Curated annotation (Swiss-Prot):
Residues 800-810 have a biased composition (Polar residues). This is ATP-dependent DNA helicase MPH1. Keywords: ATP-binding, DNA damage, DNA repair, DNA-binding, Helicase, Hydrolase, Nucleotide-binding, Nucleus. The gene is MPH1. The lineage of its organism: Eukaryota, Fungi, Dikarya, Ascomycota, Saccharomycotina. It comes from Scheffersomyces stipitis (strain ATCC 58785 / CBS 6054 / NBRC 10063 / NRRL Y-11545). SUPFAM superfamilies: P-loop containing nucleoside triphosphate hydrolases. ATP-dependent DNA helicase involved in DNA damage repair by homologous recombination and in genome maintenance. Capable of unwinding D-loops. Plays a role in limiting crossover recombinants during mitotic DNA double-strand break (DSB) repair. Component of a FANCM-MHF complex which promotes gene conversion at blocked replication forks, probably by reversal of the stalled fork. A motif (DEAH box) lies at residues 210-213. One of its GO terms (cellular component) is nucleus. Its EC number is 3.6.4.12.
Amino acid sequence: MPIDSDDNVFDDDDDFIELLQDSSNQTSNVTNEIATDSTNSTNTRLVVPNNRLLEEIPVPKRILLGPTHHKIDYGNLDKYVYPSNFEVRDYQFNIVQRAFYHNLLVALPTGLGKTFIASTVMLNFLRWFPESKMIFVAPTKPLVAQQIKACCSITGIPSSKVAILLDKTRKNRGEIWDEKQVFFTTPQVVENDLASGLVDPKTIALLVIDEAHRAKGNYAYNNIVKFMDRFTNSYRILALTATPASDVDGVQEIIDNLNISKVEVRSEESIDIIKYMKRKRIIRRNIYQSDEIKECIDLLCTAIAPVLKVANGKGILEITDPSRINFFQCMDASRKIVANPTIPEGTKWSNFFTLQLLGVVGQCFRRLNVYGLRSFFSYFNEKYTEFMAKHSKKKSSNKLNADFYFSEPIKQLMKRIRTMIDDPKVFSHPKIEAMMEELDEFFTINNATDSKVIIFTEFRESALEIVRFIEKVGKNLKPHIFIGQAKERDKFDESNFGKKSKGKRVGKKQQDDSKSSSENAQINGMNQKLQKEIIKNFKQGTYNILVATSIGEEGLDIGEVDLIICYDSTSSPIKNIQRMGRTGRKRDGKVVLLFSSNEESKFDKAMNGYEYIQQHIMKGQLIDLKEQNRMIPKDWEPKVEMRFIEIPEENHELQVVDDEDEIIRIATQYMMGGKSKKKKAAASKKGKTKEKRAKQFFMPDNVEIGFRSVTSMVRAVGSSKSLEEEKKEEKVRDVLDRIVDSDSDEEIPLGSIPIPRSEVIAHKQSTTDEQLLERDCQSGSNISDRTLDQHHSASEERGINSNFSHESNLPTPPENSPPKRKSIVLEEARIAKKKHKKSLGIRKPTIRPPSIIDQLKKQKSKIIRPDSANETICLDEDDILLPEYTNITEKEVTVQEDRREIEHDDDSEIFDDGLDEQLAMIDDMNTTKSFVEPTRIDFKDEVFKNDFDEHEGFLNNDELMELHTSYFTAIDPMDKVFYYDPSSSVHVDGANREYAFYGKIGHSKRSQVLIGLQKRAHEMAAKSKQSKTATPSEPETFQNYLDSDFIALQ
């Protein structure tokens, strides 16, 4: 049961401070949520340490616009049944048709047959989808009982197919969900069973929602629809309400939460329903203040004026007229002050207590103007007593409060109000006098036994005061209070203030026999059992007047009422409509509105705004509807079949029962197969013990299962790619930038560029040693001795044999194609070198004159090594001398006589498109290649003779400068080897591998011979300069030296 609105009044200072602190926390949380914003599309935003605002990537909603997954009975799909047992109303007929094709929100005034519409739709969905489930949810048990009776009585749905689920502790709920098709329950039960896996959401074809205006926030209605959306979009929703919302935003929220695709709204003035409406007379009576109320207001204004002046000076309240102080405005200003972090703590709480005192006076004005003297005295006397007790014990030191409560006007007020209350001739409020006039007139005309009256008021104290006054008058008037379950709030106890609590539990308040039933109910509250008893007595005539708070506005079948008196009014059009809708259902009714102060203007403003909203909603304006999701195939249009529904015998028992508990008991008995709960339990014990039901885990269709990284599910705000995709792209860009921007020989980690496996395999299959060799020649750089020596040592260590005279499986080259160089050692060395070098792409080369190395190599084109007779290596004339080599036949090698080394010029770093080179490589890959099998050659020892002069091969200054600038590069000091330093001589370890003491990699023997040659050449050049004239023997001596060195290389 809902709690009365009077329980929300802040009568206790501590409770009010606690609420404001909670409000402050909520406001600070809202501030923090700017960083972690929860958007309307369920995207959660988060600020990460690098100040990037991230959001969750929304999962695209699956909208099923095609055939439904529910099994359809096509034999019944060509027609839909419309009950002819009742009068056919145009608006009902039209709404039923639209409910077949849309998720529909129906807003009809009370008493116009919303339940009939729901029952007809459920009947036809049961015929069309016999294996699916239809669920009717209502917020309270009494409403569920009413809907069961109505549906079974209207449409004749067999009770054997109907289940009622009101108890979440029932153990066999899973079996009930499996066996039945139509369910009546509360939304909390459905939400719990969906989350527990007891019901498959994909089996729900129709969901009927009663009191749909509750579908806001985190209510269970919204959670059910959200859960179903995760699994399927093929379902139908029928939402019923009398008052959807008081503003456009409220209506839009319901539409969004329930996936509404069409809205059907009718008002009491709508053309198609006005002829079915009973006449309802609405009478307005404006009540003016009595002299006693005016006197109390004047005294309060005089006492609070200094406090209001202080608040105006601080700028915390704009109201300057004391009589216009409003409680809700003061409360709102207090919350803003507490939530403002820029205000110092001392100033903050000083302003807070000032506004709190002004709020107390504002509440006093409201009670005096609307409810009268007794309601005002009950409230203000408690505040006055509480302050005096705290001040006397020095628990309160607020000077502003003390000046107010100890002021002379307050003393006079307390004295005068006690005198007024004790005077029986003084009405608490003129409204009571007007109310009694209306009651006398009504019961004079109508029979006091058959006629019923409900009086609505907001506060319990006011309700009890009205009951007491009516009871004193008598005259066949039998009133009773009708309130919620909450107990009366404990008031301030002056006698126990300041004493230590013993911690004893507060027991249930005992009923006082000296007090009336209404007084005891006001103290202890009314539980559901007592509420049903009062309603039953009201229907039977034991009571003919109910004085109700908001509990009587909706959710209870109170019965037919002839007169409604609204003792006060609210600014909520929904509450006003629900109050007035309690009459004029089956016969004409009357509504009396009692207005005082500014109540009439608030009422008109609320109702006019509501009518404006209804008119625009009926025109389809101001709201955004969801897309239609059709369940019936497009080529099927069921035609109406008017049929007289025969009610099954098992449903007759429900028709004649009015008691809600009895309806629930009968429906539960049918659900359990005609057995009572005790008999069902006994039968289950005698039978075999059933296995425990395994928990089911339902998954949406085509769901992605398994683990996913968090970075794949979030993205930067404004980006369309996930963080995982951005990281991959960034990694590729970094590697490409390093390749393009680097001019050094820094190593690129292998595998740093992600390449698809298919491309790697294709590259391996198409890349040949000839292409690698050709690329290396184009690069214009010689293979370093250190690299070759390192490779050669590694090959020896792995035990690789250098005899390549075996048969090759490579394809033979085409005719007229020049033979290719087939140095396997060169190929492996160059592949290793390529892996460790970056490339700037193909650049336009510049031709460079032969270097000293080229000149030296030209002098020795063939060198025979005696111990290499078993090795055959194909070697170009221009290649660098290797540790192991042999002669090559003319068929295997074509000597390139005029080869010139290509050198990259820094002044011509212009990128070429590289098409010529790429086309040549493609041509080579597509050309069938074959190699001539190497043959053994008998070698003879012979001395190399040269014919160059003594100055050939020496560099001039320009050539030396170009050598140092073009061929030398800066190296790491740890890699530097001091060639002429005895301490850095080459050492040999146990594995016969050479290395330098200070360097990381040693030189090969051939490299050291070349270094020695260069050193001796410089010495001889120096000697020749000193002598200025060369002797004939010097060239011969130098030539002999070169011959001996080259022979040593063998």
